[in-house]
A protein has these predicted regions:
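Acidic, His- and aromatic-enriched active-site or binding-groove loops in soluble protein domains
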Residues: 10-22, 26, 47-82, 149
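Active-site and substrate-binding clefts of carbohydrate-active enzymes
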Residues: 70-84, 88-92, 96, 103-183
Length: 183
């Protein structure tokens, strides 16, 4: 999106929103900005396109001076008078899932709970679950996915975590305040 003109950003977002409505019958209000993509002027264009929140790599926050423990809640940003909610994607989760045994994920989420950190966000590439070299055998052949799903069920039953949509997280977790992220 940052490589597109303002008008093209809005149009690109509208195309995707229309497709999601046709395909799934939903009106998407958020998006995932992949692979460390960010420009300070994006909020104005995204809000103009009907976006109220974006999932972004935590790296954008960390290079600005945020500490990791601060990234377990939503933040707000703005440009051109338009405000946008930001959900920092947890880098640790990206490296645990699916590359490490699910017990390590459980340990990490229990640590976050003990520290009373209210949120951990994951948005990641689907090809990690079988498309990358060696991942099909690990995820499917050696049972990682089954163990992962069992671990999630246990964590939910134990009250360690709840799986929620980004909109639900925004409604239930107090934002940290304003964050102005660099390019």
């Amino acid at each position: 999106l940052p490589a597109l003109s303002q008008a093209d950003r809005v149009e690109q977002r509208q195309w995707m929103k229309d497709w999601l409505a046709r395909r799934f019958g939903v009106s998407a209000t958020g998006l995932w900005l992949t692979e460390r993509v960010w420009e300070p002027g994006l909020p104005e264009d995204l809000v103009a396109a009907g976006v109220s929140y974006a999932l972004v790599d935590d790296r954008h926050f960390l290079v600005t001076g945020f500490e990791r423990h601060q990234l377990h809640r939503p933040w707000r940003t703005e440009s051109g008078g338009a405000a946008l909610s930001l959900l920092p994607i947890d880098e640790r989760l990206r490296y645990l899932i699916p590359f490490r045994p699910p017990q390590e994920l459980a340990d990490y989420l229990r640590t976050l709970q003990a520290q009373e950190l209210p949120m951990a966000v994951l948005a990641d590439d689907g090809e990690k679950f079988g498309g990358w070299p060696g991942t099909a055998e690990w995820v499917w052949g050696r049972g990682w996915l089954d163990r992962f799903l069992e671990t999630l069920e246990t964590l939910a039953a134990d009250g360690v975590m709840r799986l929620v949509t980004p909109s639900q997280a925004l409604a239930s977790v107090t934002p940290g305040g304003l964050a102005y992220l660099p390019t």
